[in-house]
């Protein structure tokens, strides 16, 4: 049972990933690899934290929510306490910088949903790819679709894609580097 269904996320001034998109994403991940235990999840631009809290509710071993806005960080911390989400760690900081410093190859899932108006999607995807273990997953929410050639150039392969309104939702998997 998802945390969203257990309790409404209550974050002022932010809209989480649409319910239908979030449900589809987690169905994709569960069908690909149903065992979440031990997963290290990074939600680099947490916002409401809906995606990260959902990963925790599915049994992820450790979920790190990174958010720059101090007010949102306080609200995320309050949600963590209210939901008794022990696997969740809330950090205040820049998601792009945090991903750049993340241990290489240590994340099983990176949730990447930066504001649509930023010019550095490519940098964020590259930093997320570096953080991922081989076979790890990158969920990318973007204002446009990325084609398979762009994705492959970043060391990733497309797994699933969904368009819902203005949201282009990509589930990508890190592939082993070519010798």
What residues fall within each predicted segment?
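Conserved SAM-binding strand-loop segment of SAM-dependent methyltransferases
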Residues: 85-95
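Conserved SAM-binding loop of SAM-dependent methyltransferases across substrates and taxa
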Residues: 48-61
